[in-house]
Every structure is written in C-alpha cells, then in structure tokens.
C-alpha cells in the first residue's frame, strides 16, 4: 500500500483505509476531517512527528487522535538514520516484534517503509496522557526504574535469540552495518 511521506501528504482517504483495515471504525464510520500539529519541533533529529485530531461523520468508535511518525526531511539526518537502519528497525518492531510482547506498547495502526526513497510512516495510538522524558534534563531515578521494569522482560525474551528469531533485522555489530557506517 502506498503511504504519505510527510504530514502534508496525509488525506482522509488514506486515514479511513488504515483505520478500517485495523478494525478501528464501526460500520459506516468515516473520517470527515482532520488537522495536525507538529509535536517534534525542537526534539526530533531523525523524524517528524505529528498529532492528528480526527473528526468523524457520526459518534466515533475510532480514535480521537493519532500520532504519526515520518522520516526526517533533512537529507544528512535521513542518510544517517538509513545507514543505521533506524526506520527499518522501527517498522519491523511494530509489524513483527510488538505483537508478541507482553509489555505496554502503543497500538500501531500502520507501519511501512519505502527502501528506495528511505521514507517511512508509522501511525500510532496517541498516548497524550503520558509525558515524555526531558532530553536535556534527563529523568528521575523513579522514571528510570519504571523503564527498566518494562524493558527487562523484552530483553529477557529475546536475549541470545535475535538472529534466529528476526533474521532480517541487521545487527549493529554486523560487518555489513559497520562497513556502511564507516563508508557513509
């Protein structure tokens, strides 16, 4: 399925398609309008993140808002992200890995990547009621412990099994990855 590569490329038809295919719309329910705001301004180097607010044709069973992540439009940053397979890894995580995890993860409505252009899009549940850690100031010890409590089971489940479980996921210590990183 084709997908928008920037917030300006979003449209009602595409949003209706992904929400319908994810089982998020009731019979006859359609997105009739939407607006978006950039929520990555000043914090995102490798991506553009927007919050979409949705309007429906009737009382909605679908989400009131979504978070949509796009590859950055800065050529140098996009090259770095693609060299490190960051977009690919995130798409693989949401399409393949997340489904088998027993940890809290935002619902993913759609995730795809175009390898030719290096573009990607990931549409996620909007966790607006939560707050982000401060990238400059850091987080509290309590917040750090909460992260470890959630991430530890993920690491335990796949420790030493990554290559056999996800053969298409390139490791950052692989010869190919190191060679591409040095030569880019």
How would you name each of these model-derived features?
Residues 1-45, 55-63, 162:
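Regulatory N- and C-terminal appendages and interdomain linkers associated
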Residues 36-183:
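Conserved ATP-binding subdomain of kinase catalytic cores across diverse folds
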């Amino acid at each position: 399925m084709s997908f928008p590569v920037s917030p300006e490329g979003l449209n009602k038809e595409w949003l209706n398609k992904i929400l319908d295919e994810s089982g998020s719309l009731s019979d006859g329910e359609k997105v009739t309008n939407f607006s978006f705001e950039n929520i990555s301004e000043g914090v995102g180097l490798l991506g553009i993140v927007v919050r979409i607010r949705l309007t429906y044709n009737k009382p909605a069973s679908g989400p009131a808002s979504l978070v949509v992540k796009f590859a950055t439009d800065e050529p140098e940053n996009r090259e770095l992200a693609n060299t490190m397979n960051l977009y690919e890894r995130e798409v693989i995580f949401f399409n393949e890995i997340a489904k088998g995890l027993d940890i809290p993860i935002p619902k993913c409505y759609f995730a795809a990547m175009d390898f030719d252009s290096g573009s990607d899009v990931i549409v996620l549940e909007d966790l607006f009621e939560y707050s982000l850690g401060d990238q400059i100031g850091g987080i509290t010890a309590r917040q750090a412990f909460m992260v470890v409590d959630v991430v530890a089971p993920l690491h335990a489940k796949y420790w030493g099994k990554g290559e056999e479980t996800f053969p298409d996921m390139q490791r950052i210590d692989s010869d190919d990855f190191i060679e591409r990183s040095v030569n880019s």
